[in-house]
Curated annotation (Swiss-Prot):
Name this protein carries in UniProt: N-acetylneuraminate lyase
Subunit details: Homotetramer.
The species this protein was found in: Salmonella paratyphi B (strain ATCC BAA-1250 / SPB7)
Main location: cytoplasm
GO function terms (MF aspect): N-acetylneuraminate lyase activity
PROSITE patterns registered for this protein in UniProt: DHDPS_1, DHDPS_2
Metabolic or biological pathway: Amino-sugar metabolism; N-acetylneuraminate degradation; D-fructose 6-phosphate from N-acetylneuraminate: step 1/5
Length: 297
């Protein structure tokens, strides 16, 4: 199973319609688009998927739809994290029921939980996942949970934990984790340092911009396998030019707008309180969509 979890995993967006409801047909198209561009797997219901502005029922519905479209074709990881242990357990049980390959959970946030409470939270989710491997999700910039290296080392050695999504710019820590845990599946979480993360020891990555240019990230993996660091750097630079624009537009709404121009998503909206893309960026996003479609063809 550890080998199956390695690779380039798109952090899947969640499409909504003009009434702010889940757009299931666009979701299905997005899953098929990702499969078609050679993604190794999907990370479903995470930060990129706007999980924390969805109800539990909606999150379960997303898991069900994605499984219907992709089960058996690519690796599927269900992010089931919430502040509530019981709700996370409910989502973990759903992931097992729908045939996902693994579950993942961000560290519980907002309240100042003790580290032992964090550990108990993960143990409970792992138990409810009924044998599915756990991917611990460390994203201190958004969760506000600043784990020490020793705490990370403890979490990844809990029974049932097989992987870590390390969304941090600390590449020294990435290398330290890899050195301490050679058999751990280690994901780079920040797209803009994907190549550097691989060189620091990551097995692959989970990222939002893979939704629109996953083949570039696969190209970085292949270039480094072949020892062509210069090519990997060039591809990373091309990815980062896109990320520069998306940071200006707002990453999730920018990605959805590009996918709208690619005829993948019917509506390019995020769920409120996220606002639509500023109209001044639409020409640049449309040009980017055209460029990527030509590159992918």
């Amino acid at each position: 199973m550890a080998k199956a979890l390695q690779g380039v995993m798109a952090a899947l967006l969640t499409p909504f319609d003009h009434q702010q409801q889940l757009d299931s047909e666009s979701l299905r198209r997005l899953v098929r688009f990702n499969i078609g561009q050679g993604i190794d797997g999907l990370y479903v219901g995470g930060s990129t998927g706007e999980a924390f502005v969805q109800s539990l029922a909606e999150r379960e519905q997303v898991l069900e739809i994605v499984a219907e479209e992709a089960k058996g074709k690519i690796t599927l990881i269900a992010h089931v994290g919430t502040v509530s242990t019981a709700e996370s357990q409910q989502l973990a049980s759903a992931a097992k029921r729908y045939g996902f390959d693994a579950v993942s959970a961000v560290t519980p946030f907002y309240y100042p939980f003790s580290f032992e409470e964090h550990c108990d939270h993960y143990r409970a989710i792992i138990d409810s996942a009924d044998g599915l491997p756990m991917v611990v999700y460390n994203i201190p910039a958004l969760s506000g949970v600043k784990l020490t290296l020793d705490q990370i080392n403890t979490l990844v050695t809990l029974p049932g934990v097989s992987a870590l999504k390390q969304t941090s710019g600390d590449l020294f820590q990435m290398e330290q984790i890899r050195r301490a845990h050679p058999d751990l599946v280690l994901y780079n979480g920040y797209d803009e340092i994907f190549a550097s993360g691989l060189l620091a020891g990551a097995d692959g990555g989970i990222g939002s911009t893979y939704n629109i240019m996953g083949w570039r990230y696969q190209g970085i993996v292949q270039a480094l396998r072949e020892g062509d660091v210069a090519k990997a750097q060039r591809l990373q630079t091309e990815c980062n030019k896109v990320i520069d624009l998306l940071i200006k537009t707002g990453v999730f709404r920018g990605l959805k707008t590009v996918l709208h121009y690619m005829d993948v998503l019917s509506v390019p909206l995020c769920r409120k309180p996220f606002a639509p893309v500023d109209e001044k960026y639409l020409p640049a996003l449309k040009a980017l969509a055209q460029q990527l479609m030509e590159e992918k063809a």
